[in-house]
Amino acid sequence: MIIDRIEVRRVHVPMKSDAVASASFSGDRGASFTAGLDKHIISVYTDDGLVGLGETWKGTPDLAVRRAAQALLGRDPLRLSLLRLDLPHDPAVINPRDRGEVVAVPVRSIVQNPATHGFEIALADILGQAYGVPVCQLLGGAVRDRVLVHYWSGRRTPEDLGAIAKMAQEQGFAGLKIKCARDDPHYERARAVYDACGPDFRLTMDPNMRFDTIEDTLRIGRELEGLPIEVFEDPVPKDDLDAYVRLRDELEIPLALHLEHPQDVLAAVARDAADMFNLRGTMSGFVQTGYMAEVAGIRVWRGSGLDLGILDASYAHACSVVASCTLGSDIVGNFLREDDLIAEPLVYEGSYVKVPAGPGLGVVLDEDALAKYAVDQGDDGPGSWSIDTTGSGK
Protein backbone atom coordinates (compact mmCIF):
# COMPACT_ATOMS: atom_id res chain seq x y z
CA MET A 1 0.00 0.00 0.00
CA ILE A 2 1.35 3.41 -1.02
CA ILE A 3 0.16 6.95 -0.34
CA ASP A 4 -0.26 8.25 -3.87
CA ARG A 5 -2.17 11.49 -3.34
CA ILE A 6 -2.79 14.01 -0.56
CA GLU A 7 -5.42 16.73 -0.77
CA VAL A 8 -5.50 19.66 1.67
CA ARG A 9 -8.36 22.14 2.00
CA ARG A 10 -8.09 25.17 4.25
CA VAL A 11 -11.35 26.06 6.03
CA HIS A 12 -12.74 28.62 8.43
CA VAL A 13 -15.81 27.63 10.46
CA PRO A 14 -16.86 30.45 12.81
CA MET A 15 -18.36 30.00 16.23
CA LYS A 16 -22.13 30.32 16.47
CA SER A 17 -23.41 33.74 17.43
CA ASP A 18 -22.92 34.41 21.17
CA ALA A 19 -21.48 30.91 21.65
CA VAL A 20 -18.29 32.02 23.37
CA ALA A 21 -18.62 34.98 25.75
CA SER A 22 -20.89 37.72 27.03
CA ALA A 23 -20.70 40.98 25.10
CA SER A 24 -18.86 42.66 27.99
CA PHE A 25 -16.01 40.15 27.55
CA SER A 26 -15.94 40.15 23.74
CA GLY A 27 -12.57 41.94 23.71
CA ASP A 28 -10.88 39.18 25.71
CA ARG A 29 -7.91 37.65 23.92
CA GLY A 30 -9.13 34.43 22.32
CA ALA A 31 -12.82 35.29 22.73
CA SER A 32 -13.54 34.78 19.02
CA PHE A 33 -11.62 31.48 19.05
CA THR A 34 -11.48 31.36 15.24
CA ALA A 35 -10.38 34.77 13.93
CA GLY A 36 -7.21 34.24 11.91
CA LEU A 37 -7.06 30.61 13.02
CA ASP A 38 -8.04 28.55 10.00
CA LYS A 39 -7.92 24.77 9.91
CA HIS A 40 -6.93 22.25 7.25
CA ILE A 41 -9.01 19.24 6.25
CA ILE A 42 -6.66 16.54 4.99
CA SER A 43 -7.53 13.63 2.69
CA VAL A 44 -4.80 11.00 2.29
CA TYR A 45 -5.36 8.61 -0.64
CA THR A 46 -3.73 5.20 -1.13
CA ASP A 47 -3.15 3.24 -4.31
CA ASP A 48 -5.67 0.58 -3.25
CA GLY A 49 -8.54 3.02 -2.84
CA LEU A 50 -8.53 3.88 0.87
CA VAL A 51 -8.96 7.49 2.00
CA GLY A 52 -7.95 8.71 5.45
CA LEU A 53 -9.30 11.96 6.89
CA GLY A 54 -7.43 14.39 9.12
CA GLU A 55 -7.95 17.83 10.67
CA THR A 56 -5.28 20.20 11.93
CA TRP A 57 -5.36 22.30 15.06
CA LYS A 58 -6.57 25.84 14.45
CA GLY A 59 -3.85 28.14 13.18
CA THR A 60 -1.49 25.43 11.92
CA PRO A 61 0.78 27.08 9.32
CA ASP A 62 0.34 26.06 5.68
CA LEU A 63 4.07 25.45 5.38
CA ALA A 64 4.01 22.84 8.14
CA VAL A 65 1.15 21.02 6.40
CA ARG A 66 2.84 21.13 3.01
CA ARG A 67 6.16 19.80 4.33
CA ALA A 68 4.41 16.97 6.15
CA ALA A 69 2.43 16.03 3.04
CA GLN A 70 5.55 15.98 0.89
CA ALA A 71 7.30 13.72 3.39
CA LEU A 72 4.44 11.19 3.44
CA LEU A 73 3.81 10.98 -0.28
CA GLY A 74 4.95 7.58 -1.62
CA ARG A 75 5.21 6.03 1.86
CA ASP A 76 3.47 2.82 2.97
CA PRO A 77 1.09 3.74 5.83
CA LEU A 78 1.28 0.17 7.14
CA ARG A 79 4.96 0.74 7.90
CA LEU A 80 4.67 4.06 9.73
CA SER A 81 4.63 4.48 13.51
CA LEU A 82 1.73 6.54 14.84
CA LEU A 83 3.56 7.03 18.14
CA ARG A 84 6.75 8.27 16.48
CA LEU A 85 5.51 9.89 13.30
CA ASP A 86 8.64 11.66 12.14
CA LEU A 87 7.66 14.61 9.95
CA PRO A 88 9.92 17.50 8.86
CA HIS A 89 9.90 20.23 11.49
CA ASP A 90 11.23 23.77 11.55
CA PRO A 91 11.05 25.13 15.14
CA ALA A 92 10.21 28.55 13.69
CA VAL A 93 7.09 27.21 11.93
CA ILE A 94 4.57 26.87 14.75
CA ASN A 95 0.96 27.84 15.33
CA PRO A 96 -0.10 31.02 17.16
CA ARG A 97 -1.15 29.12 20.29
CA ASP A 98 2.36 27.83 20.84
CA ARG A 99 3.69 31.37 20.46
CA GLY A 100 1.36 32.47 23.26
CA GLU A 101 -0.79 34.57 20.93
CA VAL A 102 -4.14 32.84 21.54
CA VAL A 103 -4.03 32.07 25.24
CA ALA A 104 -1.37 32.84 27.81
CA VAL A 105 0.87 29.79 27.66
CA PRO A 106 4.58 29.53 28.39
CA VAL A 107 6.45 29.67 25.09
CA ARG A 108 8.65 26.61 24.79
CA SER A 109 10.45 24.72 22.07
CA ILE A 110 8.00 22.74 19.93
CA VAL A 111 9.43 19.31 19.25
CA GLN A 112 7.30 18.19 16.32
CA ASN A 113 5.69 19.47 13.15
CA PRO A 114 2.43 21.18 14.26
CA ALA A 115 0.55 19.36 11.48
CA THR A 116 1.43 15.99 13.02
CA HIS A 117 -1.97 15.75 14.77
CA GLY A 118 -3.87 15.99 11.48
CA PHE A 119 -1.77 13.49 9.59
CA GLU A 120 -1.71 11.02 12.49
CA ILE A 121 -5.53 10.96 12.38
CA ALA A 122 -5.59 10.43 8.61
CA LEU A 123 -3.06 7.59 8.79
CA ALA A 124 -4.91 5.94 11.67
CA ASP A 125 -8.12 6.20 9.64
CA ILE A 126 -6.41 4.35 6.77
CA LEU A 127 -4.97 1.68 9.06
CA GLY A 128 -8.32 1.09 10.74
CA GLN A 129 -10.02 0.67 7.38
CA ALA A 130 -7.26 -1.65 6.16
CA TYR A 131 -7.52 -3.90 9.22
CA GLY A 132 -11.29 -3.56 9.65
CA VAL A 133 -11.09 -2.10 13.18
CA PRO A 134 -11.90 1.26 14.79
CA VAL A 135 -9.05 3.67 15.49
CA CYS A 136 -9.33 3.06 19.24
CA GLN A 137 -8.24 -0.55 18.67
CA LEU A 138 -5.00 0.68 17.07
CA LEU A 139 -4.35 2.83 20.15
CA GLY A 140 -4.57 -0.08 22.58
CA GLY A 141 -8.24 -1.02 22.68
CA ALA A 142 -11.24 0.75 24.17
CA VAL A 143 -12.12 0.35 27.85
CA ARG A 144 -15.41 2.23 27.31
CA ASP A 145 -17.76 2.81 24.38
CA ARG A 146 -18.65 6.38 25.37
CA VAL A 147 -16.73 9.28 26.84
CA LEU A 148 -17.85 11.73 29.52
CA VAL A 149 -18.07 15.28 28.17
CA HIS A 150 -18.84 18.62 29.78
CA TYR A 151 -20.11 21.78 28.10
CA TRP A 152 -17.85 24.81 27.61
CA SER A 153 -18.14 28.58 27.93
CA GLY A 154 -15.90 31.59 27.69
CA ARG A 155 -16.08 34.49 30.14
CA ARG A 156 -19.65 35.53 30.88
CA THR A 157 -21.65 37.64 33.29
CA PRO A 158 -23.17 35.65 36.17
CA GLU A 159 -26.65 35.98 34.66
CA ASP A 160 -25.50 34.75 31.24
CA LEU A 161 -23.48 31.91 32.71
CA GLY A 162 -26.39 30.68 34.81
CA ALA A 163 -28.53 30.57 31.67
CA ILE A 164 -25.83 28.75 29.68
CA ALA A 165 -25.35 26.20 32.47
CA LYS A 166 -29.09 25.54 32.63
CA MET A 167 -29.27 25.15 28.85
CA ALA A 168 -26.37 22.69 28.96
CA GLN A 169 -27.98 20.71 31.77
CA GLU A 170 -31.26 20.53 29.85
CA GLN A 171 -29.32 19.06 26.92
CA GLY A 172 -28.00 16.36 29.24
CA PHE A 173 -24.59 17.73 30.23
CA ALA A 174 -23.47 17.04 33.79
CA GLY A 175 -20.91 19.83 33.98
CA LEU A 176 -19.40 22.96 32.48
CA LYS A 177 -15.90 24.31 31.95
CA ILE A 178 -15.58 28.11 32.02
CA LYS A 179 -12.82 30.56 31.17
CA CYS A 180 -12.08 33.28 33.69
CA ALA A 181 -9.49 35.81 34.86
CA ARG A 182 -8.28 37.19 38.17
CA ASP A 183 -10.71 40.07 38.68
CA ASP A 184 -13.86 38.38 37.37
CA PRO A 185 -16.97 37.95 39.60
CA HIS A 186 -16.09 34.36 40.51
CA TYR A 187 -18.41 33.80 43.44
CA GLU A 188 -21.38 35.36 41.67
CA ARG A 189 -20.76 33.23 38.57
CA ALA A 190 -20.45 29.99 40.51
CA ARG A 191 -23.48 30.83 42.63
CA ALA A 192 -25.51 31.48 39.45
CA VAL A 193 -24.50 28.08 38.05
CA TYR A 194 -25.40 26.15 41.20
CA ASP A 195 -28.63 28.09 41.69
CA ALA A 196 -29.62 27.14 38.14
CA CYS A 197 -28.39 23.54 38.09
CA GLY A 198 -28.04 22.31 41.66
CA PRO A 199 -24.97 21.26 43.68
CA ASP A 200 -24.26 18.07 41.70
CA PHE A 201 -23.49 20.01 38.52
CA ARG A 202 -19.73 20.01 37.92
CA LEU A 203 -17.88 23.31 37.39
CA THR A 204 -14.30 23.61 36.12
CA MET A 205 -12.67 27.05 36.25
CA ASP A 206 -9.86 27.69 33.76
CA PRO A 207 -8.12 31.09 33.90
CA ASN A 208 -5.29 30.06 31.55
CA MET A 209 -2.86 31.07 34.33
CA ARG A 210 -4.55 34.47 34.72
CA PHE A 211 -5.03 34.20 38.48
CA ASP A 212 -1.41 35.34 38.22
CA THR A 213 -0.06 34.75 41.74
CA ILE A 214 -0.30 32.33 44.64
CA GLU A 215 -1.82 35.05 46.81
CA ASP A 216 -4.56 35.91 44.30
CA THR A 217 -5.36 32.24 43.74
CA LEU A 218 -5.67 31.67 47.49
CA ARG A 219 -7.95 34.71 47.77
CA ILE A 220 -10.20 33.49 44.96
CA GLY A 221 -10.20 29.92 46.25
CA ARG A 222 -11.16 30.97 49.77
CA GLU A 223 -13.94 33.14 48.37
CA LEU A 224 -15.35 30.00 46.73
CA GLU A 225 -14.91 27.66 49.69
CA GLY A 226 -18.16 25.89 50.46
CA LEU A 227 -19.15 25.71 46.79
CA PRO A 228 -18.57 22.35 45.03
CA ILE A 229 -16.04 23.60 42.45
CA GLU A 230 -14.64 20.55 40.68
CA VAL A 231 -11.21 21.99 39.85
CA PHE A 232 -9.06 25.05 39.16
CA GLU A 233 -7.16 24.42 35.91
CA ASP A 234 -3.84 26.25 35.42
CA PRO A 235 -4.51 29.05 37.93
CA VAL A 236 -0.89 30.31 37.83
CA PRO A 237 2.06 29.80 35.44
CA LYS A 238 2.37 26.05 35.11
CA ASP A 239 6.15 25.99 34.96
CA ASP A 240 6.13 27.04 38.64
CA LEU A 241 5.50 23.66 40.26
CA ASP A 242 6.49 25.06 43.66
CA ALA A 243 3.40 27.27 43.47
CA TYR A 244 1.16 24.29 42.71
CA VAL A 245 2.60 22.31 45.61
CA ARG A 246 1.84 25.20 47.98
CA LEU A 247 -1.63 25.79 46.53
CA ARG A 248 -2.53 22.12 46.89
CA ASP A 249 -1.46 22.29 50.53
CA GLU A 250 -3.51 25.41 51.31
CA LEU A 251 -6.60 25.19 49.08
CA GLU A 252 -9.64 22.95 49.39
CA ILE A 253 -10.37 23.18 45.65
CA PRO A 254 -8.50 20.55 43.58
CA LEU A 255 -5.91 21.71 41.03
CA ALA A 256 -5.30 20.56 37.46
CA LEU A 257 -2.39 21.14 35.12
CA HIS A 258 -2.92 21.30 31.34
CA LEU A 259 0.02 19.37 29.91
CA GLU A 260 1.15 17.65 26.72
CA HIS A 261 4.72 16.40 26.98
CA PRO A 262 5.60 13.23 28.93
CA GLN A 263 8.49 14.95 30.70
CA ASP A 264 6.10 17.60 32.06
CA VAL A 265 3.72 14.91 33.33
CA LEU A 266 6.64 13.13 35.00
CA ALA A 267 7.77 16.35 36.69
CA ALA A 268 4.28 17.14 37.97
CA VAL A 269 3.81 13.60 39.29
CA ALA A 270 7.21 13.65 40.98
CA ARG A 271 6.33 16.89 42.80
CA ASP A 272 2.75 15.80 43.59
CA ALA A 273 1.76 19.12 42.04
CA ALA A 274 -1.74 18.35 40.72
CA ASP A 275 -4.89 16.46 41.60
CA MET A 276 -5.90 16.07 37.95
CA PHE A 277 -4.51 16.59 34.45
CA ASN A 278 -6.00 18.08 31.31
CA LEU A 279 -3.93 16.37 28.62
CA ARG A 280 -3.52 17.43 25.00
CA GLY A 281 -1.39 16.23 22.10
CA THR A 282 -1.74 13.64 19.36
CA MET A 283 -3.95 10.61 19.86
CA SER A 284 -1.02 8.33 20.61
CA GLY A 285 0.62 11.02 22.75
CA PHE A 286 -2.56 11.40 24.81
CA VAL A 287 -2.72 7.64 25.33
CA GLN A 288 0.93 7.63 26.42
CA THR A 289 0.55 10.42 28.99
CA GLY A 290 -2.84 9.05 30.05
CA TYR A 291 -1.21 5.73 30.93
CA MET A 292 1.40 7.63 32.93
CA ALA A 293 -1.35 9.39 34.86
CA GLU A 294 -3.12 6.07 35.46
CA VAL A 295 0.01 4.59 37.03
CA ALA A 296 0.25 7.66 39.27
CA GLY A 297 -3.41 7.36 40.28
CA ILE A 298 -4.37 10.69 38.69
CA ARG A 299 -7.59 11.21 36.75
CA VAL A 300 -7.52 13.10 33.45
CA TRP A 301 -9.64 14.65 30.74
CA ARG A 302 -8.92 15.56 27.13
CA GLY A 303 -8.77 19.24 26.27
CA SER A 304 -9.79 20.57 22.88
CA GLY A 305 -9.73 23.66 20.71
CA LEU A 306 -13.51 23.55 20.18
CA ASP A 307 -12.79 21.67 17.01
CA LEU A 308 -14.60 20.17 14.04
CA GLY A 309 -15.95 16.65 13.60
CA ILE A 310 -12.78 14.86 12.52
CA LEU A 311 -10.70 16.01 15.49
CA ASP A 312 -13.59 15.49 17.89
CA ALA A 313 -13.98 11.91 16.63
CA SER A 314 -10.26 11.35 17.19
CA TYR A 315 -10.59 12.63 20.76
CA ALA A 316 -13.42 10.20 21.44
CA HIS A 317 -11.32 7.28 20.18
CA ALA A 318 -8.29 8.28 22.26
CA CYS A 319 -10.31 8.95 25.42
CA SER A 320 -11.99 5.56 25.14
CA VAL A 321 -8.60 3.86 25.49
CA VAL A 322 -7.32 5.67 28.59
CA ALA A 323 -8.72 4.17 31.80
CA SER A 324 -7.80 7.30 33.79
CA CYS A 325 -9.90 9.53 31.48
CA THR A 326 -12.94 9.73 33.74
CA LEU A 327 -13.37 13.51 33.96
CA GLY A 328 -15.48 15.57 31.56
CA SER A 329 -13.64 16.31 28.30
CA ASP A 330 -14.71 19.36 26.28
CA ILE A 331 -15.46 17.48 23.04
CA VAL A 332 -18.26 19.88 22.14
CA GLY A 333 -17.15 21.70 18.99
CA ASN A 334 -20.31 20.84 17.08
CA PHE A 335 -22.43 22.56 19.75
CA LEU A 336 -20.44 25.79 19.44
CA ARG A 337 -19.32 26.04 15.81
CA GLU A 338 -21.59 26.69 12.85
CA ASP A 339 -20.77 23.27 11.36
CA ASP A 340 -18.65 20.20 12.10
CA LEU A 341 -17.97 19.38 8.39
CA ILE A 342 -18.92 15.71 8.76
CA ALA A 343 -21.96 14.09 7.14
CA GLU A 344 -23.37 12.64 10.36
CA PRO A 345 -22.59 14.34 13.68
CA LEU A 346 -21.14 12.45 16.61
CA VAL A 347 -23.82 10.88 18.79
CA TYR A 348 -24.33 12.38 22.26
CA GLU A 349 -26.37 10.62 24.93
CA GLY A 350 -26.76 12.63 28.11
CA SER A 351 -23.31 13.83 29.12
CA TYR A 352 -21.51 11.25 26.97
CA VAL A 353 -20.33 11.07 23.37
CA LYS A 354 -20.37 7.66 21.73
CA VAL A 355 -17.12 6.42 20.23
CA PRO A 356 -17.59 6.04 16.45
CA ALA A 357 -17.74 2.38 15.52
CA GLY A 358 -15.43 2.52 12.53
CA PRO A 359 -13.74 0.86 10.77
CA GLY A 360 -11.16 3.57 10.96
CA LEU A 361 -12.21 6.94 12.33
CA GLY A 362 -15.86 6.27 11.55
CA VAL A 363 -16.79 9.65 10.04
CA VAL A 364 -17.41 10.89 6.49
CA LEU A 365 -16.83 14.38 5.12
CA ASP A 366 -19.76 16.63 4.27
CA GLU A 367 -18.49 17.92 0.93
CA ASP A 368 -21.18 20.61 0.64
CA ALA A 369 -20.30 22.04 4.05
CA LEU A 370 -16.61 21.80 3.20
CA ALA A 371 -17.17 23.88 0.07
CA LYS A 372 -19.20 26.44 2.04
CA TYR A 373 -16.43 27.08 4.58
CA ALA A 374 -13.44 26.76 2.23
CA VAL A 375 -10.81 29.51 2.33
CA ASP A 376 -9.53 30.62 -1.08
CA GLN A 377 -6.15 31.94 0.00
CA GLY A 378 -3.67 30.46 2.46
CA ASP A 379 -0.48 31.78 4.05
CA ASP A 380 1.64 31.30 0.96
CA GLY A 381 -0.68 30.15 -1.83
CA PRO A 382 -4.12 28.76 -2.64
CA GLY A 383 -6.25 27.58 0.27
CA SER A 384 -6.82 24.20 -1.41
CA TRP A 385 -4.12 22.12 -3.04
CA SER A 386 -3.04 18.53 -3.67
CA ILE A 387 0.09 16.58 -4.52
CA ASP A 388 0.51 13.10 -5.97
CA THR A 389 3.20 10.61 -6.89
CA THR A 390 3.12 11.57 -10.58
CA GLY A 391 4.68 14.88 -9.62
CA SER A 392 1.59 16.86 -10.52
CA GLY A 393 -0.30 19.01 -8.08
CA LYS A 394 -2.49 22.04 -7.83
Which positions does each model-derived feature cover?
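Metal- or metallocofactor-binding catalytic centers and their adjacent structured scaffolds
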Residues: 5, 45-130, 393-394
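Extended hydrophobic packing segments that form well-structured cores
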Residues: 361-394
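Conserved, mostly hydrophobic/aromatic
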Residues: 3, 49, 68, 119, ...
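Hydrophobic faces of well-ordered beta-strands that scaffold small-molecule active sites
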Residues: 52-54, 147-153, 174-178, 201-207, ...
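Shared catalytic-loop signature of beta/alpha-barrel
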Residues: 23, 222, 228, 239-254, ...
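Metal-dependent enolase-superfamily TIM-barrel catalytic cores that perform enediolate-based chemistry
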Residues: 137-251
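N-terminal amphipathic alpha-helix/helix-capping segment at the start of soluble metabolic enzymes
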Residues: 2, 129, 133-144, 353
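Structured beta-strand/loop patches that form or line metal/cofactor-binding pockets in enzymes
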Residues: 1-48, 53, 57, 71, ...
